[in-house]
A protein has these predicted regions:
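Glycine-rich FAD pyrophosphate-binding loop
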Residues: 1-5
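Short hydrophobic/aromatic beta-strand or adjacent loop that forms the aromatic wall/cage
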Residues: 48, 92, 178-180, 199-201
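Central helical "cap/lid" subdomain
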Residues: 144-196, 207
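Short, solvent-exposed loop/turn segments at the edges of secondary structure
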Residues: 6, 10, 197-199
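Helical element adjacent to the flavin cofactor pocket in flavoenzyme catalytic cores
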Residues: 93-150, 154-164
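A short catalytic or substrate-binding loop motif that flags glycine-/basic-rich loops and adjacent residues
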Residues: 43, 133, 195-198, 207
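Dinucleotide-binding Rossmann-like beta1-alpha1 core, especially the glycine-rich loop
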Residues: 8-91
């Protein structure tokens, strides 16, 4: 959840993956599942606009339309000039995609976990050592030691730190810095999300409910 929260808390429908139909289709499937399971934390009342840049984009408007049709996700043409200066984007599309309020979802999960007597959450702890002890995995973090038959590595960008402790080969991950700015917009953009594809461009999304 932290990774998605940092990445604008977007509930992906698949539009970000015009060069991977399988990823887009999986995203659309999980989009429906997330909306069904966690609809209480969603922000849905805004226009989600995707556009393809006329310059330096790996995907043009025609390709984006074909991709959306193949993935069976919404893609309604709107005039690019409604949102952009003339000549900047060769296609602009109204789509279906939402954001979620991570604080609302976090509170819900904490309430669910608090009801489980065998769950303990440790904050501000990093594992010092991970080792296999017979049929269980033993994780040591300072003075705390826990054992479990399975480990789930959900560290996202820190996945290779855990791999190193386990003696596993690292994933070939490329890290990129990204600036996320919280700002107040005027009324023209208050109920609009805009994402320019497909390259080193920008995205503007509503944040929270």
């Amino acid at each position: 959840m932290r990774a998605t929260y940092i990445n604008q808390a977007r509930v992906h429908m698949g539009y970000h993956y015009p060069r991977s139909y399988s990823t887009a289709i999986k995203s659309a499937h999980y989009f429906e599942r997330f909306c069904r399971d966690y609809g209480f934390c969603l922000h849905t009342e805004f226009d989600q606009v995707y556009a393809t840049s006329a310059h330096f984009s790996w995907t043009n408007a025609a390709e984006f339309r074909r991709f959306c049709a193949a993935a069976e996700i919404r893609c309604d043409d709107v005039p690019p000039e409604k949102y952009f200066n003339p000549g900047l984007c060769d296609g602009t599309f109204l789509t279906t995609e939402y954001t979620y309020d991570a604080q609302v979802l976090k509170r819900w999960f904490l309430e669910q976990l608090a009801a489980l007597p065998n769950v303990e959450i440790l904050y501000s702890r990093k594992p010092d050592r991970i080792e296999q002890a017979g049929s269980v995995w033993r994780v040591t973090a300072g003075e705390y030691t826990a054992e479990a038959p399975y480990l789930l590595n959900a560290t996202y960008a820190g996945v290779n730190d855990i791999h190193a402790m386990l003696g596993l080969p690292p994933f070939g991950i490329k890290y990129e810095k990204c600036e996320i700015i919280l700002c107040t917009v005027d009324e023209k953009l208050r109920n609009t999300g805009i994402t320019v594809m497909d390259g080193p461009f920008f995205s503007l999304m509503p944040f929270g409910q």
